[in-house]
Amino acid sequence: MPKRLDINTILVIGSGPIVIGQAAEFDYSGTQACQSLKEEGYKVILVNSNPATIMTDTATADKVYIEPLTLEFVSRIIRKERPDAILPTLGGQTGLNMAVELAKSGVLEECGVEILGTKLSAIEQAEDRDLFRTLMQELNEPTPPSEIIHNLDEAYGFVKEIGYPVIVRPAFTLGGTGGGICHNEEELIEIVTSGLKHSPVTQCLLEKSIAGCKEIEYEVMRDSNDNAIVVCNMENIDPVGVHTGDSIVVAPSQTLSDREYQMLRNTSLRIIRALGIEGGCNVQLALDPYSFQYYVIEVNPRVSRSSALASKATGYPIAKLAAKIAVGLTLDEIVNPVTQKTYACFEPALDYVVSKIPRWPFDKFESANRTLGTQMKATGEVMSIGRNLEESLLKAVRSLELGIYHLELDHLKELDKETMKKRIIKADDERLFIVAEAIRQGVTKEEINEWCEMDFFFLQKVENIVNMEREVKANVGNMEVLQTAKEMGFSDHYIAAAWNKTEREIYDMRKENNMTPVFKMVDTCAAEFESATPYYYSTYADENESIVTDRKSVVVLGSGPIRIGQGVEFDYATVHSVWAIKEAGYEAIIINNNPETVSTDFSISDKLYFEPLTIEDVMHIIDLEKPEGVIVQFGGQTAINLAAKLEEHGVKILGTSLEDLDRAEDRDKFEAALTKLGIPQPVGKTATTVEQAVAIAEEIGYPVLVRPSYVLGGRAMEIVYRQEELLHYMKNAVKVHADHPVLIDRYMVGKEIEVDAISDGENVFIPGIMEHIERAGVHSGDSIGVYPPQSLSEKLKEQIIEHTIALGKGLNIVGLLNIQFVVFEDQVYVIEVNPRASRTVPFLSKITGVPMANVATKVILGQDLVEQGYGTGYHPEEKEVYVKAPVFSFAKLRSVDTTLGPEMKSTGEVMGKDLTLEKALYKGLVASGINIPTHGSVIITVADKDKEEAMEIAKRFHEIGYNLLATAGTAQSLTEQNIPVQVVNKIDSEDYNLLDIIRQGKAQFVINTLTKGKQPARDGFRIRRESVENGVACLTSLDTTRAILRVLESMTFSAHSMKEITQTKRHEVVHA
């Protein structure tokens, strides 16, 4: 059927900020969809609240709205733009829930707007646990014994009948939010209560646990003519019981017999047909390893995280084709963009193995509960491709950027068998490493299978790796063994350690013996047809398929997996850099390993290499391509960290030189440069021993800010108030020695300012200055940022501009730089300079219209700022106010403290823009998920050092009609100031206490600041966690609280009696 001509304008709903469970994969799918619809001649309007994405670039759609994804704002856009249809299935769970809400509110009917792709009835049938179960019964498809519950009593009834363990799955939620596995009554109460709170329809499905079955996924597509195909099937190495987003996944499935494969394939196609989905859909199934019994777990009637993985694993662009199907085209009419010969109705075939390993944030959150279950915890993932599973797995392991080059972790070597057994049974982020360690220590595959039901096939593959390790160690210098190890994916790093050589020596040894990998193409058809895609992976085989052209090329290093501190912002910069390289006439080559992102879409660059970002893997590509040089500025710390090793290999680093990069990162050199330029910075020194650290802190005076050098996202950074805290930090947070010094600075309590600039060595252009609402000490990525600055005097602004220009020139920056300043006692100090793209580049690029990554890339390639129409100076400020607000995923990570500090904790960001700061803040806060009611109760429990400051805040809450609740200490201070307050019991009280108020939803805000000294902090910690678990806004910074107050005050009309007004006026009578 040809495309529909009765619709012209389509509104695409984006997925909002990056949170655990919904990451960069929707930037990729949304971008593809918008481009796909524009290709077909439709007018595309996009609404999304996330400024860090390619999707929200003005070029992606005809009109882009960066507004909160709430009923209020999306309805307003629909009424204004009057689209003919909306396409919600590419915006993840957020997009689906929005479509349901819009339909129920009547706005779609009122404006005559149709839902494309997946009809509302299909969304509800797939997402509503009750309707889904009924449909499966009609189709005769087995689901685990289950019951829909709406309260705890119903849950008790089901468990009585079926017994433990049971799985709780809340309806209409994302990444298993609020769900889990219950083994006893205590867990049942906790998880069901949480699940009902998180489900927008207060409904959970309780099902008998089928943990231990194989978990299989099918990615399927269907069109309006009922053509349906399987794009890819995937198998989780972890059996059912671990969320698929937290599972290690391989594609295609490795352990299914043909009968099992066809049986599950037929089921998946039957389900997508019954739901009537037009587009992409993900079906999750459980298969009993010992019989042909299977169960349907769930269906996602939309493009998902798995579809992004399937797209990159096969080369088949699911989101692009789903958008075309949504407007009426059929699979047999759409040409496959990869082969450019076959049609989209051909099912892809793979002649390689793909592995996906999740990237968890536990390196950031030491206190987080690392156990994996049905609630997702990973922030991102890596993918790798190999000719065998061992190679594919080992490449994925070294892509994780945890400093791991092999399937082994030193700290696991001490584990005894009993501990290993416990951890393998329970499943955490290190399970595969523990399995390898257990095999090294002689535990049999049978025992391990008994503990965790991981398939023997996968255990055999791990055993193959362990056996190869023994071979390598026993045959030092043997070329045949080296060849076999390389074919299995062993890294030079591992072999060098085993053979007591340097990594460079192994590299040279291989080159002398012509032992280098070849590059194979990902072509969707296992080389059956000729293919046009330049999308490659490395392997040790015979024929090289990557043809080097005679064009001059430039390599851009991507930023690897999404994690806290290094998010989608860096992918945004990478993509813009690639486009600029192409505009400048060079061949653009990208190396990256993240399957979720736009940068790994093969249509972006001239050549895409899907490889780990390690020196060995990057050098293989450089040896083949011989580029003009490598750009490391846009890949975050990942790429910067490779610069020195690349230069040792004789590779040219384009842009800021290695020496100048080092000068910005090395503390002593940086201090010398600032002194020379006459730019003030907080007093600070470098310590290489614990004793030195104590002496420095004494000398400069507490509080001090301590951190290791060379970090991103403020890892292991802390504000320390006294010596015992400093000793605790030195012992637990860092391993200090001469190569890894610790920086100790005077901590200045002042306003933090952030600047992004572009320098060509002569000229320095400043697109924007941003002011942080939270004072210095809260990580810039967790602060609310405001542009243009609202409270900076012209004099201070001039100082900041002068310092930025001086730093750009003085540090010989060529490309981007990001500077953080603190304003203390009317003086500007430099806190740090990052000689690379920062996470604010997308935000400022969108606001100012200066395509920063593009301009910086052209500077790097030799076109100065003046030639590009910019010069030295500050870009004129915009009239509107823009707010960048952080978004956290605390609800997914139990036992993580929500207090803000110098260590970054947010996973994503949103933008609010309007004519006043209050309105922009309101939009930013609402978009970030904070509910802002205009009346209610506030609980105030603050540290002694904050009491004075909190009084003014409490008074303002009282004046706009809020009820104040406080524990005895804070209440006394309020009463002394004549501020009415209701005393509540502390949390250790047996009677009705503060936690009960939070649990019962009787408080709208909780203001709780951290008690220094870390121990009474346990009370504060419980208050903060209880707020998160119950969806109450918990404010740990008084600056953020003030910002919310500004919004509330702007929304509230004052109510004063006439007597109060006349009393105030009386003193103001002027006598003539």
Curated annotation (Swiss-Prot):
The entry marks the following residues as binding Mn(2+) 4, namely E832, N834
Outline what the protein does: Large subunit of the glutamine-dependent carbamoyl phosphate synthetase (CPSase). CPSase catalyzes the formation of carbamoyl phosphate from the ammonia moiety of glutamine, carbonate, and phosphate donated by ATP, constituting the first step of 2 biosynthetic pathways, one leading to arginine and/or urea and the other to pyrimidine nucleotides.
Q: Where is this region: Allosteric domain?
A: 930-1072
Q: Which parts of this chain are annotated as the region Carboxyphosphate synthetic domain?
A: 1-401
Taxonomic path: Bacteria, Bacillati, Bacillota, Bacilli, Bacillales
> Know the name of this protein?
Carbamoyl phosphate synthase large chain
The record lists Mn(2+) 2 as bound by E298, N300
Residues covered by region (Carbamoyl phosphate synthetic domain): 547-929
Per UniProt, the enzyme's principal EC class comes to ligase
Q: Which residue ranges does the record assign to the MGS-like domain?
A: 930-1072
Q: Which SUPFAM superfamilies match?
A: Carbamoyl phosphate synthetase, large subunit connection domain, Glutathione synthetase ATP-binding domain-like, Methylglyoxal synthase-like, PreATP-grasp domain
Annotated residues that bind ATP 2 are located at R707, R746, E752, G777, V778, H779, S780, Q820, E832
- Report the SMART domains cross-referenced here: CPSase_L_D3, GARS_A, MGS
Region described as Oligomerization domain = 402-546
Among the Pfam families in the record, one is CPSase_L_D2
What detail does the entry give on cofactor binding? Binds 4 Mg(2+) or Mn(2+) ions per subunit.
List, in alphabetical order, the GO biological process terms annotated in this UniProt record. Answer: 'de novo' UMP biosynthetic process; glutamine metabolic process; L-arginine biosynthetic process
The record describes its quaternary structure and partners as:
Composed of two chains; the small (or glutamine) chain promotes the hydrolysis of glutamine to ammonia, which is used by the large (or ammonia) chain to synthesize carbamoyl phosphate. Tetramer of heterodimers (alpha,beta)4.
Which residues bind ATP 1 per the record? R129, R169, G175, G176, K208, I210, E215, G241, V242, H243, Q284, E298
